[in-house]
Amino acid sequence: MVILRKTLIFYPTNSAQSIMQTINPRSPRPLSTSFDRSVDYDIVVMGGAFSGASNAILLKREFPDLRILIIERTEAFSRKVGESTSEVAGCFLSRVLRVGMHMNSKHISKHGLRMWFHNEETTTPGRSTEIGPAYQGRLPTFQINRMTLDTELLLIAESLGCEVARPATIKEFDLGGIGKNTITFKSETGGETRTVTAGWLIDATGKAAKIAKERKTWRSLADQHPTSSMWTRFRNVTYLDSDEGMRELDGVSSTVLAQRGFSTNHLMGFGWWCWIIPLDSGEVSVGITWDSRLFTPPANGTMSERLKEHLLKHPVGKVMFENAEAVENDNQYYKSLAYWSDEVTGDGWAAVGDACGFMDPLYSQGLDYCAHSIYGALALLRDHYAGYCVKDTIVHRNQEFKRSYFNWFNALYKDKYWYLGDAELMHAAFLLDIGTYFIGPVRLVYTDQDSEFTRMPYYGPTGRFFARFMAFYNRRFVTLAKKKITAGTYGAMNSDQAFLITKSFNPDFSSFKFVIKGIKIWLKLEARLAFTPAAQDAMQPSVATPLPQAGQYRHA
């Protein structure tokens, strides 16, 4: 057992010395001579995008003598859905990868998360209820063009001495154990097929999750969280901070001093939400995520037409997208978003990023998840290359990942789509979810990147306590949403309200004030709806419930 910052972290005793010696993992050091290096490469990374390139960068910075091969399928990274980061990923990019200059010069700084609600009384966009910050955020967060970021990171990895094979297709691989792995891949330019040996294989193949599917450890979470997404890009979008946008938002335009257009704007509804992310190109990434138990988006037309039809049913969406044009052949659809793997590491291999699993994009924590998995793999490999036995660490990492995944899911996302369309409930959830995020994960990674990125969130005694508290209020909010449906008051506060955050969330215990405020709103709702039965089988439309809209609401 090792004590770091008065925090108890349980690691195998034979790795304790290495942890104490690697408080700064970026300090270059020699490889141990205690292992066989007769393989062709010390490490082969399958996938050269964010997770694969990041892992290679961190390993080469610490062990410059490592022979690393990165196999990337594409000749050039394609345009991907625009991504928004939250504060943990912002810390990873700026303080761990140390690409802050690139992020600030090539991507858009994010002005927080902003949610927009409406009901049948919302006759103008300016009457839409808004949840979000009144000022700019204090910590670095970004609206990311993934094609640009992935390209930059792979170039950095190559400049550090990593060999890159692209475009190349992985034909097969054999997980023979540490120092006994083989992988066969084909160059798509010369047509040459190569088989190489590797000390370790890193799976950074994203949702393809090659190792998990090969080992049959990939698991869908569709039985508990049947969400899907479709998205596209639009040009000629009316920004909320433009002259036309400000005029349309008359009545609320002066209440926010930050630029709304640089927030990640979410349009909210029962069983669904839409993201709106500005990109450096001037285009806008737009998508919808929905719970198929509750909602189905419009069915007719192309994907872009279906998405635009839905957007125009929301007053704020209509302002922004009425004259917008979809970018041709630039849309995607994913069914059953949530999945996980029983194993994230083993004898001579490790998975990172989306190859480990994915939950939900609502709070933009996808790269948080990637950051922790990348750093966990780094910690494992640096122990190995420093000469320590990692058998017990492998067992620990697999246990930690699974428990963290479900603690995280139950705390934030289980059945949450029941109350996404109610501004009053989401106001309480916003304060509680983000308040606990700053008190826990954000505070910890800004205090000690090395130990905290190594650990998965919501794990350990304190993490479990917060996860249980969050899962409890999440369950209560689901029940309260059903009670509101019965009472005919679901969405009653979706017009003419401004739930603005006028004091910043800070990565310290001062953010408890937001948690306390959220609890007060919650308890008032419990008292008001104490004797109201919860709806069971179906939405019961009322004047205040925004039904119908584009798409179809389903029996729940």
Where are these regions (language model features)?
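Beta1/beta-strand and adjacent pyrophosphate-binding region of the FAD-binding site
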Residues: 37-49
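Glycine-rich FAD pyrophosphate-binding loop
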Residues: 60-81
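C-terminal helical "tail/cap" subdomain of flavin- and related membrane-associated enzymes
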Residues: 379-556
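N-terminal FAD cofactor-binding segment of flavoenzymes
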Residues: 78-121
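FAD/FMN-dependent oxidoreductases across multiple families
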Residues: 270-272, 278-280, 292-413
